[in-house]
């Protein structure tokens, strides 16, 4: 029904003169119907009435400010691309409804937010191409999918990187269903349980982060002198800088050396995460089985890890290893059970609240509980389908490097878990600024928190800076930080 789709487009872009955050300012039309669709859309545009917004017979009012009117005009003048169709508008702070067709997906007008009554359009041939073009943007607030084939619409909707997707509709809101975006459209939700939980606080008093200084010493190595490498893309890799640091035990004995990761190593880890995006598409059951297998492999080497913890910290590590195994089992159990909801909304239809992985998460692991803290943060994140870059405990990094072989033998795809060792202060800022890292969690030195949040503001990255009581099972509390909620509005019936 092309006519209904045309009405939907008119409502999406020219509601409030296109000056709304969820305006449907980019139009993707199937190539076979593009000419017919554009003709009908232009005819509908010609009938739009422009004038005093207090007149109930008026469709389009004035632009919010003359500066915004000038900005829209300047943007169009700076990029005279495609074919422009424009209706007339009265004098004053008005801008005529505008349609620009024939644009390339990389055109600045397709990539930048115009925030006005301007609709830019391009065509696609297949649904796969449509999804690629739709997701080729910095923003991700809302999208509309129009199709008579509901199966096709339900195939496309979950693939769109947006916080809310309307099927055969637009601009539908309700307090029962969350509204919010991803990428540079921001984070957080209004409405729904996910919107409410954003304003809640834990009942228990928050834990305090402990910053622990590394042990020093001048003793020689007791056995073979080893330098642990980084773990990137399922392989051990030498640091780009070539630098390493000695790690000493509490009595000054040299336990080994660890690599010092740099910005370049972080970039390599991000590339490995990008190559492992298929992990998000795997079933919760498969992710659970891999986590169970990881727990079994760690259990088989429990004595070895407990001994390593004692040599690093001076304390018995048996309880920490047992708790780490328990956290893996807990995350595995949640992998296929932390599911979404079906909301009753005021249309003849439903809104599906789907839990989706955040993407790539950078995690600064706590100094204390070097094994338990790492696994407690890592396991829920990968259980939800995320890829992670872990900056190991700064004073006790060797326990993380011992984990490489457990990961290698647990059927975990390369790139899902990447482990860096080195100074958290060297890795925190690049993590927060990197455009391909979707969230940063910091359980390390609290002095790093402010810098992380300031650096992440440039790309609206989700941040979580705080402390947890690692002796408790925090898996359920971590899961909301590891997921985004996408609401898909689906009509049914006549």
Task: State the predicted function of each range.
Residues 1-104, 133, 167, 211-213, ...:
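ALDH superfamily catalytic-core signature
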Residues 121-125, 418-423:
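Short acidic-hydrophobic, aromatic-tinged amphipathic segments that line or gate anion-handling sites
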Residues 129, 349, 426-427:
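Short acidic active-site motifs
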Residues 151, 252-338:
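Glycine-rich loop-to-alpha-helix module at the N-terminal edge of alpha/beta enzyme cores
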Residues 199-255, 337:
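Hydrophobic face of amphipathic alpha-helices that form TPR/SEL1-like repeat modules
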Residues 243, 250, 333, 337-413:
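Conserved small-residue-rich beta-alpha loop and adjacent elements
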């Amino acid at each position: 029904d092309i006519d209904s789709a045309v009405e939907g487009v008119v409502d999406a872009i020219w509601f409030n003169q296109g000056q709304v955050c969820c305006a449907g300012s980019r139009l993707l039309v199937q190539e076979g119907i593009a000419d017919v669709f554009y003709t009908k859309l232009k005819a509908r545009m010609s009938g739009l009435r422009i004038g005093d917004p207090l007149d109930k017979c008026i469709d389009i009012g004035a632009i919010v400010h003359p500066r915004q009117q000038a900005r829209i005009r300047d943007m169009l003048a700076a990029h005279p691309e495609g074919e422009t169709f424009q209706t007339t508008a009265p004098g004053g702070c008005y801008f005529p409804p505008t349609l620009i067709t024939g644009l390339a997906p990389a055109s600045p007008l397709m990539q930048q937010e115009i925030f006005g009554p301007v609709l830019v359009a391009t065509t696609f041939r297949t649904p796969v191409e449509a999804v690629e073009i739709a997701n080729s943007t910095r923003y991700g607030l809302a999208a509309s999918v129009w199709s008579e084939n509901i199966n096709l619409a339900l195939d496309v909707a979950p693939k769109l990187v947006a916080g809310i997707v309307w099927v055969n509709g637009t601009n539908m809101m309700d307090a029962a269903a969350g509204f919010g975006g991803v990428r540079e459209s921001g984070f957080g939700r209004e409405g729904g349980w996910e919107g409410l939980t954003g304003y809640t606080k834990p009942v228990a008093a928050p834990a305090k982060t402990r910053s622990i200084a590394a042990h020093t010493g001048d003793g020689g190595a007791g056995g073979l002198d080893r330098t642990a490498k980084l773990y990137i893309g399922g392989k051990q890799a030498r640091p780009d800088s070539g630098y390493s640091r000695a790690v000493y035990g509490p009595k000054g004995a040299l336990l080994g050396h660890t690599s010092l990761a740099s910005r370049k190593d972080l970039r390599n880890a991000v590339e490995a995460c990008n190559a492992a995006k298929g992990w998000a598409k795997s079933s919760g059951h498969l992710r659970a089985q891999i986590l169970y297998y990881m727990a079994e492999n760690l259990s088989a080497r429990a004595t070895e890890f407990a001994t390593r913890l004692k040599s690093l910290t001076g304390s018995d590590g048996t309880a920490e290893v047992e708790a780490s195994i328990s956290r893996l089992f807990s995350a595995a159990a949640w992998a296929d059970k932390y599911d979404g909801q079906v909301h009753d909304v005021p249309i003849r239809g439903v809104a599906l609240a789907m839990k989706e992985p955040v993407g790539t998460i950078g995690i600064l692991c706590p100094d204390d509980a070097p094994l338990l803290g790492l696994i407690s943060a890592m396991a829920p994140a990968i259980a939800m389908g995320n890829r992670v870059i872990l900056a190991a405990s700064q004073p006790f990094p060797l326990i993380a490097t011992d984990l490489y072989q457990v990961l290698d033998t647990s059927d975990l795809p390369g790139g899902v878990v990447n482990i860096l060792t080195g100074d958290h202060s060297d890795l925190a800022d690049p993590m927060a600024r990197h455009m391909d890292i979707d969230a940063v969690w910091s359980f390390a030195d609290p002095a790093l928190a402010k810098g992380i949040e300031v650096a992440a503001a440039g790309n609206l990255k989700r941040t979580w800076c705080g402390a947890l009581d690692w002796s408790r099972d925090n898996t359920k509390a971590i899961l909301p930080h590891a997921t985004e909620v996408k609401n898909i509005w689906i009509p049914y019936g006549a």
